[in-house]
């Protein structure tokens, strides 16, 4: 019995050590996919939040990054299908490719194409990555490329506007030809980027989170308070029983003249082969 007890104690200790190593790896991986962001860049206030569906759950494939470039501030938020190590590794490839292309490539739709091409060798048979890429130009105009992701929400004048182009695009990794569209970006506007855990949050009756709950939360005094209010609204709606991770990015247009939008900026859409074609944003 004494020998058996010693053996069992050894097995227990090794399991605890393995769990501790896996926890450390998960925490380091989450930090790599969801890096700390500065509170402000050239007059744009920034806040970010990540909430796992369940405490201690496997780190999923939610990711985000913000990079100042010569073409403006470039942002990505994305969601890799699945959880665990495979999702983490694929998400890291997405961020690595975005960081390279965001700095070196002039057109945002080409950045999306380069990221899509770069991650293709790492995709499994059923893998995919949805993402939204946003560029905030020095003049304040927004450029958006949506790769199969939930569309950004523009909070303006107390209401929400969904930013969508006229054509749907597939997730990253499936093709390399993407469409960009533009939208105006005015002082005081807030842009919310998010993963599906937000809009797919359901209550006990199966109802999704109402849009007016999001709009109300975004009225808070600053971006950090707004995201805290939004997560609190999700918690109340779901009773604390969310079924998916939530990553949130909120950017607010400040009064810095470098980010002031020109008056009457038209909404347009472009593809690499049709740079002047008009489009719509709803």
Placement of each model-derived feature along the sequence:
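Conserved beta-strand-loop-short alpha-helix elements that form
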Residues: 71-84, 144-146, 184-205, 250
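Catalytic core of PPM/PP2C metal-dependent serine/threonine phosphatase domains
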Residues: 86-160, 164-165, 178, 237-240, ...
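Membrane-proximal soluble helical/coiled-coil segments
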Residues: 24-125
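Active-site-proximal, acidic helix/loop segment immediately C-terminal to a metal-coordinating Asp/Glu
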Residues: 87-97, 101, 168, 185-240, ...
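Transmembrane alpha-helices and immediately adjacent membrane-cytoplasm interface residues
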Residues: 1-20
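PP2C/PPM family metal-dependent serine/threonine protein phosphatase catalytic domain
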Residues: 37, 44-57, 117-119, 150-182, ...
